[in-house]
Regions:
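Short, basic, glycine/proline-bearing loop/turn elements
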Residues: 105-110, 144
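Residue-level signal for short, function-critical loop segments
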Residues: 34, 111, 176
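Cap/insert and terminal regions of metallo-dependent hydrolase folds
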Residues: 115-197
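Binuclear metal-dependent hydrolase catalytic cores
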Residues: 1-106, 117, 123-124, 181, ...
Length: 197
C-alpha cells in the first residue's frame, strides 16, 4: 500500500523511480485520505504523462490499483485501524493515525501548526499519550514568520507538541532541503531529549 497525504511534487515525484513498481508481480495499491480513487488516479495520470515523464505511467503499469481510503481501512481491519485527520496545508493534506492494540502512531507531515485552532486541537486530541508522533520540521521557529502560509511547522513546535501531548517518541521529518546533515545533527544535539528527535 502507498498512502499519500497530498500530491505536491515533493511527495509524488519519487514514485516512478522506485523500480519495484515496474515488476508486474508487485501489486501496488495507492490511496489517499484526501480524494477519491477516481480523483487520485487522475492526479497520477496528469503528473506522469509524457510531457513530464517518458511513458504514460498509470496506463503502462497494470499492477497499479487506485482505491478509496475506506477500502484500505477495510483491508487493514485485522491488522490495525487507520484514520485520517485534516491538516493545514495549501491545497489540503491528510494526516494519519494508526492504532494496533494499545499502540498509536500519528503522522502529521505538511501541516502549518498554530494557524487553525480546530485542526490543531484535533491533532492534540489524537496524539495525547500516543507512542510516536511523526512531525513536520521543515523550519526553525526563527524561520517561520516569512514562511507563513507555506503549510509547514517548525522543529521547536514539534518538541513543544510532543511535550504537551505526552507522546512517548517524536520523529522530526520533512526537513528543509536546504538543511545540511551537520545542521540536523546540531539541532538534534541542541534538542536532545529522552523522547527522541
Amino acid at each position: 500500500y502507498l498512502v499519500f497525504s497530498h500530491f505536491h511534487y515533493d511527495h509524488i515525484q519519487g514514485l516512478p523511480f522506485n523500480y519495484e513498481i515496474f515488476d508486474p508481480s508487485n501489486k501496488v495499491t495507492i490511496c489517499s485520505g484526501l480524494v477519491s480513487a477516481k480523483e487520485l488516479r487522475e492526479v497520477f495520470v496528469r503528473a506522469f504523462q509524457p510531457m513530464y515523464f517518458p511513458i504514460p505511467l498509470v496506463d503502462t503499469l497494470k499492477n497499479l490499483k487506485f482505491v478509496d481510503f475506506s477500502t484500505v481501512q477495510d483491508d487493514m481491519t485485522k491488522l490495525c485501524t487507520i484514520e485520517t485527520i485534516e491538516l493545514n496545508h495549501p491545497g489540503g493534506a491528510a494526516g494519519y493515525v494508526v492504532e494496533k492494540n494499545d499502540k498509536k502512531v500519528c503522522c502529521f507531515l505538511d501541516h502549518e501548526y498554530g494557524q487553525v485552532d480546530k485542526v490543531d486541537n484535533e491533532m492534540v486530541r489524537k496524539a495525547t499519550n500516543c507512542d510516536l508522533v511523526i512531525w513536520d520540521g521543515m523550519f526553525l521557529d526563527e524561520e517561520l514568520p516569512p514562511k507563513k502560509g507555506w503549510g509547514h511547522s517548525s522543529i521547536e513546535q514539534g518538541v513543544n507538541f510532543s511535550d504537551a501531548t505526552n507522546c512517548k517518541n517524536l520523529a522530526i521529518a520533512h526537513h528543509s532541503p536546504a538543511r545540511t546533515d551537520e545542521q540536523l545533527k546540531e539541532h538534534s544535539n541542541n534538542l536532545k531529549r529522552d523522547k527522541g528527535f
